[in-house]
């Protein structure tokens, strides 16, 4: 990944962004926000189009407490992380098995990138 050509990286980023936006459309909050903004994932044709996307605010995330912002059925969530931050009102993030596998791979790649190996941990 670290040696990918810039054009290939941009294509990959756009593909993954569109996938993420399609997933987000499964969440009522984002259905509403996309509709109000008059935008859909298909309207994102370049990375610069990210400027068309509406902002999400922490109060909106907190309003979804506890499970209102999951884009997958609750039975697919295998780990939950909550934080209260400074407001005392929780924000909840749910992770699927695939999310955790992706996270593990990302961390391993980052460790390799900075020169760490199996014997260093």
Label each residue range with its predicted role.
Residues 1-82, 88-105, 109-118:
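Nucleotide 5′-phosphate-binding alpha/beta core
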Residues 121:
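Active-site-proximal cofactor/substrate-binding loop regions of enzyme domains
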């Amino acid at each position: 990944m670290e040696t990918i050509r810039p054009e290939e990286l941009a294509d990959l980023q756009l593909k993954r962004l569109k996938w993420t936006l399609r997933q987000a459309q499964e969440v009522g909050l984002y259905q509403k926000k996309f509709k109000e903004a008059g935008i859909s994932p298909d309207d994102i044709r370049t990375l610069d189009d990210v400027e068309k996307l509406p902002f999400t605010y922490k109060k909106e995330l907190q309003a979804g407490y506890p499970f209102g912002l999951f884009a997958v059925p609750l039975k697919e969530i295998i780990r939950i992380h909550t934080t209260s931050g400074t407001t005392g009102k929780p924000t909840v993030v749910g992770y699927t098995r695939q999310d955790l596998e992706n996270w593990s791979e990302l961390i391993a790649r980052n460790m390799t990138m900075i020169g760490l190996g199996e014997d260093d941990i």
